[in-house]
């Protein structure tokens, strides 16, 4: 009798131990920069495959207001973790010295900031924008880099008419010829134009990173108070997200299914192509292939800060890479390799 009871107790204890992550789930709100589209697949893959759950996390993923505006939500603690533009974080930190928000994981090693136009506008080089009308949403992450892009390419911006447009009408205005070009994320504007009936060979995408910008793109950033109180939660979220990115890279066709479950009105063919473009151009660069997912090159980050300083007047001392990005929550490099 004693043996049976002991065995039963032992089995129960082992079962409890094996279920402990699931039974102590921490509710965590995570804000994307934008809609549930192809490039958001890694987070939903991590959710569907139980990677977050294995870290003891019950993650809720919400859409966001753009890659710039959401930073304030993380700073305020509305969302403890978010996915936003690291260059805008540099400026935000300078303007809000009491908000020690830091990036903890780089996602877009090469930013998707782009100038998108139609072939008929004959915008083949940056200076071709002179004399044109550029449609730009004020909260757009790409437009946030406009001044640096102008400086690097010696554009006379007095000859470029900037027209403030909303995100919903940005691509329609370009398609209708109401503006000559727009700022946007490459994989967003390109495929949005395809859905408007514009042919592939009529769409011109000019990546700012191919024209002088050394900037990074969107990163995972964390509220400082939350990170201080919950370092294991942050590390677990980062670890699970990296697994989601690696799985998405290995099998984008399977990964896109996780997006479609949350956005049934989307066109799966378009979203898969959007995902593949972002993986090729933004997520998985030669540097990431060599060094793994999630980290940064401090020298490049310092160059990016210097580039921001060309067109942005810092109120305080220019930050160092360590002021903006911390690798302390990243898993070992071996776990981040593709």
Regions found by a protein language model. Name each.
Residues 1-9:
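Bacterial N-terminal signal peptides that target proteins for export
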Residues 8-18:
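Bacterial N-terminal signal peptides
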Residues 19-24:
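Sec/Tat signal peptide C-region and signal peptidase I cleavage site
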Residues 26-176, 180-187, 206-208, 213-214:
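Short, glycine-/small- and polar/acidic-enriched structural segments
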Residues 107-117, 200-226, 238, 277-283, ...:
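Periplasmic-binding protein-like
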Residues 301-338:
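Conserved C-terminal helix/tail region of periplasmic/extracytoplasmic solute-binding proteins
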